[in-house]
């Protein structure tokens, strides 16, 4: 069976700080992994596809990296109100 684990479950950083979110898979997923952010009342917004390609109109504060079974999302210059998937809660300290 295919397994996908997003970590950490929660991360905190100050406004303007940087956080890293990891996605570990049981098989190679690098060409198929995409990162989305939820939008209340709307479909999720695509941030990154093919593990590291920034979607059109998305800020360069978001960076995808890694390959194979471990893919990473790095978010820099944090702002309030950022959240990612059901797997990671991002708390921005004001």
From Swiss-Prot:
Record region (Framework-2): 35-49
Annotated region (Framework-3), positions in chain: 57-82
Protein origin, superkingdom: Eukaryota
Chain positions covered by the region annotation Complementarity-determining-1: 24-34
Gene3D superfamilies listed in its UniProt record: Immunoglobulins (2.60.40.10)
Stretch list, region Framework-4: 84-93
InterPro entries, A to Z: Ig-like_dom_sf, Ig-like_fold, Ig_V-set, IgV_Light_Chain
Matches recorded under Pfam families: V-set (PF07686)
Spans annotated as Complementarity-determining-3: 83
Region (Complementarity-determining-2): 50-56
Keywords: Adaptive immunity, Immunity, Immunoglobulin
Any GO BP annotation: adaptive immune response
Positions of the UniProt region annotated as Framework-1: 1-23
Any one cellular-component term (Gene Ontology): immunoglobulin complex
PANTHER family per the UniProt record, alphabetical: IMMUNOGLOBULIN LIGHT CHAIN
UniProt miscellaneous comment: This chain is an antibody to pneumococcus strain III vaccine.
Protein name: Ig kappa-B5 chain V region 2699
